[in-house]
Swiss-Prot record:
Species, as recorded: Aspergillus niger (strain ATCC MYA-4892 / CBS 513.88 / FGSC A1513)
Ranges of biased composition (kind: Low complexity): 1-22, 496-506
Membrane protein topology class: Peripheral membrane protein
Keyword Signal: no
Record's protein name: Autophagy-related protein 17
Length: 546
């Protein structure tokens, strides 16, 4: 039973037959009653605790209302925040995919370019290393390689164009990397803000008494309404206890006033009473006004037995008043602890809300101010790479065409060597036929000459000289002439470098390595080793092509 209940029960239990009634034979002195009055007045200082209880209830109710609002706002922001974070990381993934895909394609194209350029350089080196045989060139000319017949300006211009495309792509890639790095810095800042958010949530989970708090992003508000109800109950009980103390004080005042010489003492003691207090919607009567009314009210006649009963109740209640004061102090201590718990939960919710607001503001700033730039940079790189990719592919095709052209030049030179060898072989066959034919014609000529001379000797004296003018002539002679060939059908025109000359006699001395222009056509005389090397290279190319 509470102290207030005990104090009230004591008032009801007192009566003429109670033990206190047995003490009625010896009425207390005025000093004793005054001491009880002073103690009762001192106990009324508990009104400060009741005031504080009222403040606690008001603060707790305000904290609960604020917590509900904060929790609702935080929940709304968290849902939007989660969606924005998913969208943000999706955008970052897409931007990174653009960078990786472009980098991979660029690396692949560069590898193909390096391969094509290395192949072209190798072909050009082969042209430099291949010296045109001196028999193909005018006498006295400095040695020349096949590379001397190639105009490399086209190659250099193509390489310059490719370098420009590569530099522009590298510049766009560097700008995208810088943009992505800034994007990552933004994400790192958001992660730090999220770290603060998680710390606040972790603190809320660790301080929550709910069994599922550790798995919840936000602390539950379910414990706060019961705590507020507990505070209201404490405040109400404290008001009731204070009211019982006031009643005890009024009883002391009445007893003192009914004691001879006590009126002045009562007015002196009750001259500085505290004001009234309102707790949980109900008001404690104005103490000062009540005491003033009690002091100034005329004394009702009181029998000795009634007076004795009043004194007995006063003495019994005086013994319990200290317990009532202690209970009020205990309750205010509990209320302070409960309020601290409520405010702590409110502060945790507020810290989560502030952390959420921080992340949300950061995301909003990023989305409106900087994110469009990061996305635009990715689009810019895609556009630049698309343009330069087409140019580089075109340049790659041109490099391949040039390499095919120069490689064809090498192959054609080897073919030229074999063609010269073939023509010389044909010339040799022609010369052989010519020699054999001339030898037979010479034989026929000698036989004809001898036969004509024999006829002249044997029959000439009998034939008149004018019978046939040709009877004394030698046989006709046949002479071979070398005539330069014309231009092959479809071949480009060129200036002839030899005049039609009569054929040399078989016994005439032969010319040097190359036939002279007197023979109608110049066919270089190539070493056998040169022809064999050219044939070997052509066969090797044919094997590679298969």
């Amino acid at each position: 039973m509470s102290a207030s209940a005990s104090l009230s029960a004591g008032s009801d239990a007192s009566g003429p037959g109670s033990p206190a009634g047995d003490q009625g034979n010896a009425l207390p002195q005025l000093d004793s009653l005054i001491s009880h009055l002073v103690a009762a007045k001192r106990s009324l200082s508990s009104i400060n605790h009741v005031w504080r209880a009222n403040e606690i209830v008001t603060s707790a109710r305000s904290a609960l209302e604020e917590s509900v609002v904060i929790s609702a706002r935080t929940g709304f922001l968290r849902r939007g925040l989660n969606n924005q974070l998913r969208l943000l990381y999706s955008v970052r993934s897409e931007v990174e995919e653009v960078s990786l895909r472009g980098r991979s394609e660029f690396a692949s194209v560069l590898k193909s370019l390096d391969t094509a350029d290395a192949r072209l350089r190798k072909t050009l080196d082969s042209l430099r290393d291949t010296i045109v045989h001196a028999s193909f060139r005018p006498e006295g000319e400095e040695p020349r390689s096949l590379h001397d017949f190639v105009d490399e300006r086209g190659v250099e211009e193509l390489r310059a164009a490719l370098k420009s495309s590569i530099d522009r792509t590298n510049e766009a890639q560097a700008e995208l990397d810088t943009s992505n790095s800034a994007f990552d810095d933004e994400l790192q800042s958001i992660k730090q803000a999220l770290g603060n958010y998680r710390e606040a949530t972790k603190l809320a989970s660790s301080s929550s008494s709910s069994s599922s708090a550790s798995n919840s992003s936000l602390p539950s508000l379910s414990s706060m309404p019961p705590m507020l109800q507990s505070l209201e109950m404490h405040a109400q009980e404290m008001a009731n206890l204070l009211e019982s103390l006031v009643q005890h004080f009024d009883l002391c005042v009445t007893a003192v006033k009914h004691t001879e010489g006590g009126g002045a003492a009562a007015r002196s003691i009750t001259g500085d009473m505290p004001a009234a207090v309102t707790v949980s919607g109900r008001g404690v009567p104005n103490i000062e006004q009540g005491i003033h009314d009690n002091l100034n009210a005329p004394l009702d006649p009181l029998s000795e037995s009634d007076y004795q009963e009043m004194v007995n109740v006063l003495i019994k209640d005086a013994a319990e008043a200290e317990d009532v004061v202690m209970e009020i102090q205990d309750r205010i201590g509990d209320m302070e602890s409960i309020l601290e718990n409520i405010l702590s939960q409110r502060d945790v919710l507020l810290s989560i809300y502030n952390a959420t607001i921080g992340v949300f503001r950061h995301l909003s700033s990023l989305a409106t101010a900087r994110l469009p730039g990061y996305i635009a940079q990715a689009h810019s790189f895609t556009r630049v790479w698309g343009e330069e990719h087409d140019r580089i592919n075109g340049g790659l095709a041109d490099l391949s065409d040039l390499n095919t052209l120069y490689d064809g030049f090498l192959e054609a030179y080897d073919g030229l060597i074999l063609e010269v060898a073939r023509r010389r072989h044909v010339r040799q066959r022609v010369e052989k036929v010519l020699r054999e034919t001339k030898h037979k014609l010479d034989q026929l000529y000698e036989e004809d000459v001898n036969a004509r001379e024999t006829f002249r000797v044997e029959q000439g004296d009998y034939l008149p000289s004018d019978i046939w003018p040709g009877i004394g002539r030698e046989p006709m002679r046949i002479e071979f002439r070398r005539i330069s060939g014309g231009i092959l059908k479809g071949a480009p025109p060129e200036q002839p470098d030899a005049q039609d000359q009569p054929a040399a006699e078989p016994n005439e001395p032969q010319s040097g390595p190359s036939e002279t222009t007197e023979e109608g056509e110049i066919i270089p005389h190539l070493p056998k080793s040169l022809v064999e090397e050219a044939l070997h290279r052509l066969k090797a190319r044919n094997r590679q092509a298969m």
